[in-house]
Amino acid sequence: MISPSFRKGMLKERVMDLASQTTILPLLFGCLGIFSLFRLLQRIRSKAYLRNAVVVVTGATSGLGRECAKVFHAAGAKLVLCGRNVKALEELSRELAGSSQGQTHQPFVVTFDLADPGTIAAAAAEILQCFGYVDVLINNAGISYRGTISDTIVDVDRKVMEINYFGPVALTKALLPSMVERKQGHIVAISSIQGKISIPFRSAYSASKHATQAFFDCLRAEMEEANIKVTVISPGYIHTNLSVNAVTADGSRYGALDKNTAQGRSAAEVAQDVFDAVGKKKKDVLLTDFVPSMAVYIRTLAPGLFFRIMASRARKERKSKSS
């Protein structure tokens, strides 16, 4: 037989549980509401910062660059679209102009090849002629690589470095004096998680992104007094044609959408993250899932473990290719 005191205790416990639930749930929803409001206010501030800003996007014909162009245009930015394919750039310019809702800024198109150092000075001059100045430079264009170090000809290493590192550096240096003169500007480098950690069979690509990270970190420190912001963005895998267009050990096109790239985030999502990072004037942004993010910390805090993991990955990948 249950005693009255026991029943009273059970009833009291249930009442306390109910009270705690009625207290916690509103508190939880309140916190979520405050967080959502905070994110909304940040996005409004980002749009205000970038409205009417002159934004240059390299590699704008496809993938992340194309999506960045859409996001920044929708926010009211004045765009300069850069790339090699003039037809694709002009089509994008018309598409953006046609999608405008009260937007009056017709995007300009400037064609040049980052792999050709001789074209960059003239391209920078043409970019400056579009609106007279540049507020934001997004160094997005790049090329990926697949291959073993032992089989890769050095011309491939040079090509990847030219497009991913020397080209963006040259363009940045060409546009930098006008920013310094105005005491205003924002330079964005689209790097990669592979600019922070190195994985097997990506040597040329990873080396170019490590160089990118180092250069723009130095630039950030040197340009602080000139009021020029520098943001390095390091995404993980993005579902684009980057792997399809990657160069291989002998210089030929890889021509395949590999599994990790196919499972990557959409370019539209990452472009929105790029927009937010620029609007918030962030310095260094890692856009990856939990495991790659942890790999960055493991590389720093437990390098021996990281090296063993990468060696194991290399063995598995080599075995899968030979089977």
Curated annotation (Swiss-Prot):
Can you list the disulfide-bonded cysteine pairs? none
List positions binding NAD(+). Answer: 62, 64, 205, 209, 240
GO BP term, example = neutrophil differentiation
The protein's location, in the record's own words, is: Endoplasmic reticulum membrane
InterPro entries found in the cross-reference section:
NAD(P)-bd_dom_sf, Sc_DH/Rdtase_CS, SDR_fam
EC class (word): oxidoreductase
Location, primary (coarse class): endoplasmic reticulum
CDD domains attached here?
11beta-HSD1_like_SDR_c
Q: How does it sit in the membrane?
A: Single-pass type II membrane protein
Pfam families in the record = adh_short
What's an example of a GO molecular-function annotation for this chain?
Answer: acylglycerone-phosphate reductase (NADP+) activity
Q: Where are the transmembrane segments?
A: 18-38
Q: Which residues lie on this side of the membrane: Lumenal?
A: 39-323
Q: Where are the Cytoplasmic topological domains?
A: 1-17
Task: Please give an example of a GO cellular component term from this record.
Answer: nucleus
UniProt similarity note:
Belongs to the short-chain dehydrogenases/reductases (SDR) family.
Q: Which NCBIfam families match?
A: PRK06181.1 (NF004825)
Q: Which PANTHER family match?
A: DEHYDROGENASE/REDUCTASE SDR FAMILY MEMBER 7B, DEHYDROGENASE_REDUCTASE SDR FAMILY MEMBER 7B
Q: What is this protein called?
A: Dehydrogenase/reductase SDR family member 7B
What gene does the UniProt entry assign to this protein?
Dhrs7b
